[in-house]
Amino acid sequence: MISPQELIERITSAANYHDCIVIVREKTQANLRWANSTLTTNGVIAERSVTVIAFVEVEGGMASGGVSRTDVAAHEIESVVKEAELAARGAGQAPDASELAKNISVGSWSEKHQATGPDVFARIAPALGDMFTRSNADSIELFGYAEHSHISTWVGSKGGLRLRWDQPVGRLEMTGKSHERSRSTWEGVPTRDFSNVSIPDVDAIIRKRLQWQGKKIEIPAGRYDTVAPSGCVSDLLIYMFWSSAARDAYEGQSVFAGKDGAKTRIGEKLSNHSVNLYSDASYKGLESIPFISATSSGPMSSVFDNGLAQTRTNWLTDGSLTALAQTRASARDTELSFTPIGDNLIMEVPGASGSLEDLVSGVKDGLLLTTLWYIRQVDPATLLLTGLTRDGVYRVKDGEVIGAVNNFRWNESPVDLLSRMKTVGTTQITQPREWADDMDRVAMPPVVFENFNMSTVSKAN
């Protein structure tokens, strides 16, 4: 197999058109999986992806087109270079054409991919075995997995881009069931190297929540003050983040479209708290790729922006919308700043403090969630979402959990929820559940939302 660096050099040398950008990603992933409190599988996988993007001069301007492969062998280089050129010429003049970045170097270009492996689980594996033993003794069934990935990205071009980034990421997800599976709960822990993962803590949380479910309380659909753990908050705001393309707003096709003659809602107060929502490639513990590496163009990305820096973008400042996701092309059209979408998402409220337990203790009458799932969009104009609660909804009275209630289908807009935050806790790096496969670097606080709409009772368990 040709090294990523050599492959990029060969492809860009063979490209006899205006410019050529090659993006190579190498990924290794180690995993442990278990069911019924028994380890079922473990292993390591290795993957490579290669994207070749051609930039070709055509009548009226510049065209771009790309092809992606799981790998490119030496004898395939000429054909993949030609395929990219044909894709560009077939696409015609690119509406997002911009001047290409050149002669930028980032990272240790020449180093090999540092593969992850089973050793990353050395510290937690014995503790997992102990947890399985205890759970079997207490008739608790455990299901879940631990996985750790290491992704190396190289971006190179004819124009002198030589960019490299290494991204470690991991997570542990655990579902616990008891009493003939009539009780079920979940816990997830994000990590970069498993040094922060405490299996005894996960065990204690699962046992406590299963115990809470010993008392069942049936309640009707309605609006309830609802304590959302940081993971639930992240699943809601990630969807909002993905819906924040400036061009869509400018064209009146999103919740961020302007009113009363304004093209967008930038500058509008969206929250009743001084919310700061931002992406920052250097955020401690959530470090992410500091340059753009788009394999295709769309509302939020442009291959013409590849190689440009991603630093910090403030999406909300003091509760007001301050930016929407932009390419350079959309920034020109909307006459707004170039604010590329980031690879992490952080929400903070200055002065807010308190753990999830602290927020629960302050609720007189409400609900406590575990997770949200099956989240789908109902109305893009308001970003109304629907979904189900999962793995435990608890009744809170006078600051204490008094039992478990039935599940619900809910209907809410994360944009609207920003203005109905009763209490906000301390921001922490957290584990989304619904979107964890797509967005794995998030820091959010737990939040008490006022009058959260539990629209119908769900029979889901």
Regions flagged by a language model, labelled:
Residues 1-302, 317-318, 400, 427, ...:
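Active-site bordering "gate/hinge" segments
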Residues 262-461:
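Dual-mode signal for accessory low-complexity, basic/Gly-rich regions
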